[in-house]
A protein has these predicted regions:
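Solvent-exposed alpha-helices and their adjacent loops that cap or buttress functional pockets
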Residues: 67-69, 88, 128-131, 215-219
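N-terminal subdomain of lithium-sensitive/metallo-dependent phosphomonoesterases centered on the IMPase/IPPase/PAP
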Residues: 1-80, 149
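An extended, acidic
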Residues: 131-243
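Short, low-complexity, intrinsically disordered N-terminal peptides in bacterial proteins
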Residues: 1-9, 123, 129-131, 237-243
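DPxDG-like acidic metal-binding loop motif
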Residues: 68-123
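Residue-level signal for inorganic ion chemistry
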Residues: 14, 18, 48, 83, ...
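Short loop/edge segments at beta-strand edges and connector loops
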Residues: 59-61, 122, 162, 208
């Protein structure tokens, strides 16, 4: 099984588990989110350790083993991206299973279980025409000011949406053209989405245009831009002007 096949299978299985937990009805609200996080995390860790015992794992829901910093291959996972959306019965939450090699986003899968979708790096490039005005996905609950300013400068239509994975995949599958975040994220929030976006032929970088670097000692990675390649220069200039 290739790394991409493994990422896809694990993300899909974790998504099936999360749907079953939510359908069970035993918990609601924060308790539901906590149970989903914990059980999906354990499943992902168990599957990755069984299939790739020499690799390290960085997960939002597990104790960080800093020995990973010296490793070439590190799986970076978020078992439930969008806990609020999951607990509220919405569909814009995700499972992230990403592999960074030498600090770069390499292989990944992002599952949107409530939509029965799994996106992976072995899907290959996707090409969608940019609509005018361009469409920008922003946080439903806490859209950063810079995203609003950039959206205004570009004349973009803003589309509120939940989790980071859901927003990134909206760009991957052509439902949006730009995803800009500057409100604080960690490596597990965007490693898998960035890898899938890059494999799909999109632009993915920090908001200053610099590369996304993973497996750092401090996993804080506070900003992200995913957009159509043909929009990248325009969006980066609008970001610089808005800061």
């Amino acid at each position: 099984m290739t790394d991409a096949e493994l990422a896809r299978a694990v993300a899909d299985e974790a998504g099936v588990l999360l749907l079953a937990i939510r359908a069970d009805g035993g918990e609601t609200g924060k308790a539901l989110g906590a149970r989903g996080d914990a059980e999906a995390n354990q499943l992902i860790i168990d599957r990755l350790r069984a299939a790739r015992p020499a690799d390290f794992i960085l997960s939002e829901e597990s104790v960080d083993d800093r020995a990973r910093c010296a490793a070439r291959r590190v799986w970076i996972v978020d078992p439930l991206d969008g806990t609020r959306e999951y607990a509220e019965g919405l569909d814009d939450w995700a499972v992230h299973v990403g592999l960074a090699i030498d600090g770069r986003p390499h292989t990944a899968a992002v599952a949107l279980p409530a939509l029965a979708q799994v996106y992976a790096t072995d899907d290959g490039p996707r090409f969608h025409p940019v609509l005018h005005p361009p469409r920008m996905v922003v946080s439903r609950t806490r859209a950063p000011d810079i995203a609003r300013r950039v959206g205004e400068a570009l004349g973009a239509t803003l589309i509120p949406m939940g989790s980071a994975g859901a927003k990134a995949m909206a760009v991957v599958d052509g439902r949006a053209d730009i995803y800009l975040h500057d409100g604080g994220q960690y490596e597990w929030d965007n490693c898998a989405p960035a890898a899938v976006a890059l494999a799909a032929g999109l632009h993915a970088s920090r908001i200053d245009g610099s590369p996304l670097i993973y497996n750092c000692e401090d996993p804080l990675l506070p900003d992200l831009l995913i957009c159509r390649q043909e929009l990248a220069d325009t969006v980066l200039k609008a970001i610089a002007d808005a800061r």
